Amino acid sequence: MAGAAPACADPAPVIQAMRAHDWARAQALAAAFPDPIAQKLVTFARLLTPDTASAADIGAFLAANPAWPDQAALRHRLADAITNDPDQATSLADCQAFKPNLDEALLRCADAERLAGHAETARALAQRAWIEGVRDAQDEAAFLTDWPDAATPDVQWRRFDALDWARDPAAARQVARLDPARHAEAVARQAFQNRDPAALDDVADIPQAQRADPTLLLDQARWLRATGADAAALALWRGAAAAAETHAPPDRRPAFWTERDRLARAILATGDNEGAYFLADDPNVAPDQAPDALFLAGWIALRRLHDTPRALIKFQSLQAMSHSLITQGRAWYWLGRALAGEPAHQAMLHAAAYPTTYYGQLAIAQLSGAASIAAAIESAVGPAVPPAQAKAFAGTEMIRAATLLIGWGDPHWARQFLLRQAQLATDAARFALVASNAASLGLPDVSVQTARLAGRQGIVLPRLGWPAPFDPPATPGVAPALVLGLMRQESSFDPESVSPAGAIGLMQMMPATARQVAGQGGQDLKNPDLNMRLGIAYFSGLLRQFGGTLPYAIAAYNAGPHRARTWIAENGDASTLAPDVMIDWIERIPFAETRNYVQRVLENTAIYAAHGAK
């Protein structure tokens, strides 16, 4: 069976030496390889290891190798080196040269500047460290003893604000240190976050001028929705909250949209379509969230308000603002739904030009029938790469490093080099080269992730982006194309994948679910065959639970069967109604992750079926 590059049980001696931190032996072993990249990899690994290099060495490597992976980790090591260097003169020089951001390094730099007689610079650095870090209670006490004049009222408020925004428990300790004029606002924010039923009473103690604070109003809006007061939350958004959003810091704007989106979907269930439209029509939405806001507003206008002019404005804006394949397919499809006659037909033709997307496939089905989807997918052509460019790319440091690491039995590390190249790619040929090299090195997950990044720039990798490195076992009622589509979305075909929640392997099985399906524990869920067998068995059971309705089963696989049943109860059962109703049902899933998941798995399934995995 084909598959991904396995993690070698007996990695090369040079890898073993690096893992043992035997750097002299590792360099000697690397020197035996004709490619100098071998020795550079050892240097790189050493620089990434705590307490093995000076700040100057790490800084020099960073400056000379901006395209190498793990840039953030290197900067962290650089900050650690500055923090731990006992020499004042060296620390001062490194602080001034590299300007670290981590709070421990900031404090070390503050000390060095203070000893050098640079009092104002030292104080400013200490204040940055206090605002951005120093989370431990003992460290707080030490800081306040060492820098008694640094925690000014303004600085102390900024510290509370940063910790509170990050939902750090240390925020609660800061309230007593605040200027009395800001105390009531901080108490109210904490009360809203803690779902205190009496939180609104705290607002009465806040000076009027502070009640328009954007974060305070966002916390209040969240509290109202979470406590079931949707109408009051909408009223707040129609008044103070929407006005405050215009003054929110740019890095907090995404949170405002997330809350508006959640409330809009809850308000839809009550039948207040105008209220839901108001929430979706967010004039201050952050750029990354703008496509979602435009689409939701357009969808509500068309499907709930039956207001075609407003819907067209939103869908046209959506189409114009992004090159993403998914966004283009979605925008053109819904323009086709909103328009009539020949303009509608032309819009659907535009949507059908994106056959690897969910809405592109729906457009093809509407234009010429579902049977035409496979041919359209097969006709999609990826970027052409001149042989000379392919040869040159294979000779770059990143590809040489990845190739060497695969040979050394460390596919995990090789993956980082290829993913970094995908992140830096800006043209179609380079995306294709990263994906093809990943495929040849046995890293299909990198090919998939590269295709996703390319898709955001309007570039399709029709074959490279949908590999089939594993053969799903034959299972009645569960087509191989569907299993491949699930695995692509779940793990990108990385059998070693472990999610933050603890889901494991190709089909991201939770150990408890695997025990339930298998009737026993102790299973090696990183084993591809076992993972597929258990995952397919679980999905097959979901299909039976939901009467064979694929979108319901897919939603249940992602979010759990209880949530899927809740959504059916709230939004109606679309399984026996016209296809348009199911399209709307999917769009009404309240979790953005699950909405996206269902659409991606459906489009993946069609692609794999077109590729022959029936």
Residue ranges and their predicted role:
Residues 36-37, 44-45, 59-60, 64, ...:
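Catalytic glycan-binding domains that act on GlcNAc-containing polysaccharides
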Residues 26, 91, 122, 172, ...:
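Single-residue signature of alpha-solenoid repeat helices
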